[in-house]
């Protein structure tokens, strides 16, 4: 005979005579043997004891139906089997509770890991979007800033355009200026030549001729 966990069950030896044991069990069930002509006592104590024995017998009957193989055992063996069976059920409940708690913790860890992964992905996407937007803004600002400058210096003959070109390429500006435009000469260089008729005609000896004039 084995219990639900596989451990052998050793029935306890009876210390009483079998007849005495059966008599005690019969008393527990129905109050023992009664003579056919005997009348039930109407004493309140006897009635209360009889009802108590009936309730005990009913509880034993229910317990025998719950314990595996209890209907084929005597009262003592059935009680021992009930004790082992209750311990086995308690151990099974403890194991199932531990497994359920472990499963719930694993689900919670998985949910937290998934939430962190989603948050990291969103953060990386936001950073990439910010970097891309900053590059586009810089390019747009450069284009917008260069456009007014080009409009301001777009006049080819204006002073601003010449100053810009001179600042960018002084040597080339000087060469281009020398090739296309020379500075004006001072007015003292140009001497107006006097009409030949105004000069006096002199001979070799320095004498004046009949022509009238002054040098």
Swiss-Prot record:
<feature type="region of interest" description="Basic motif; degenerate">
    <location>
        <begin position="40"/>
        <end position="53"/>
    </location>
</feature>
<comment type="subunit">
    <text>Efficient DNA binding requires dimerization with another bHLH protein. Interacts with LAX2.</text>
</comment>
<comment type="function">
    <text>Transcription factor that seems to regulate organogenesis in postembryonic development. Involved in the regulation of shoot branching by controlling axillary meristem initiation. Functions in association with LAX2 to regulate the process of AM formation. Possesses transactivation activity in yeast.</text>
</comment>
<feature type="domain" description="bHLH">
    <location>
        <begin position="40"/>
        <end position="89"/>
    </location>
</feature>
<keyword id="KW-0539">Nucleus</keyword>
<keyword id="KW-0805">Transcription regulation</keyword>
<dbReference type="GO" id="GO:0005634">
    <property type="term" value="C:nucleus"/>
</dbReference>
<dbReference type="GO" id="GO:0046983">
    <property type="term" value="F:protein dimerization activity"/>
</dbReference>
<dbReference type="InterPro" id="IPR045843">
    <property type="entry name" value="IND-like"/>
</dbReference>
<dbReference type="InterPro" id="IPR011598">
    <property type="entry name" value="bHLH_dom"/>
</dbReference>
<feature type="region of interest" description="Disordered">
    <location>
        <begin position="1"/>
        <end position="48"/>
    </location>
</feature>
<keyword id="KW-0238">DNA-binding</keyword>
<keyword id="KW-0804">Transcription</keyword>
<dbReference type="GO" id="GO:0003700">
    <property type="term" value="F:DNA-binding transcription factor activity"/>
</dbReference>
<dbReference type="InterPro" id="IPR036638">
    <property type="entry name" value="HLH_DNA-bd_sf"/>
</dbReference>
<dbReference type="GO" id="GO:2000032">
    <property type="term" value="P:regulation of secondary shoot formation"/>
</dbReference>
<comment type="similarity">
    <text>Belongs to the bHLH protein family.</text>
</comment>
<dbReference type="GO" id="GO:0045893">
    <property type="term" value="P:positive regulation of DNA-templated transcription"/>
</dbReference>
<protein>
    <recommendedName>
        <fullName>Transcription factor LAX PANICLE 1</fullName>
    </recommendedName>
</protein>
<dbReference type="GO" id="GO:0003677">
    <property type="term" value="F:DNA binding"/>
</dbReference>
<keyword id="KW-0217">Developmental protein</keyword>
<dbReference type="Pfam" id="PF00010">
    <property type="entry name" value="HLH"/>
</dbReference>
<feature type="region of interest" description="Helix-loop-helix motif">
    <location>
        <begin position="54"/>
        <end position="89"/>
    </location>
</feature>
């Amino acid at each position: 005979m084995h219990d639900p966990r596989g451990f052998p069950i050793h029935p306890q030896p009876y210390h009483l005579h079998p007849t005495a044991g059966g008599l005690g069990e019969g008393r527990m069930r129905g109050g023992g043997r009664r003579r056919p002509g005997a009348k039930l006592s109407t004493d309140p104590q006897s009635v209360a004891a009889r009802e108590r024995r009936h309730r005990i017998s009913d509880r034993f009957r229910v317990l025998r139906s719950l314990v595996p193989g209890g209907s084929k055992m005597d009262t003592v063996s059935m009680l021992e089997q009930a004790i082992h069976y209750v311990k086995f059920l308690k151990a099974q409940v403890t194991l199932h509770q531990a497994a359920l708690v472990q499963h719930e913790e694993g689900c919670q860890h998985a949910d937290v890991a998934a939430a962190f992964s989603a948050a990291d992905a969103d953060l990386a996407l936001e950073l990439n979007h910010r970097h891309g937007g900053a590059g586009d803004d810089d390019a747009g600002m450069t284009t917008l800033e260069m456009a007014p400058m080009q409009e301001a210096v777009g006049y080819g003959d204006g002073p601003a355009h010449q100053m810009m070109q001179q600042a960018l390429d002084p040597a080339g500006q000087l060469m281009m200026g020398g090739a296309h435009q020379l500075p004006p000469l001072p007015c003292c260089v140009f001497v107006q030549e006097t009409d030949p008729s105004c000069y006096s005609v002199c001979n070799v000896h320095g004498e004046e001729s009949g022509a009238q004039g002054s040098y």
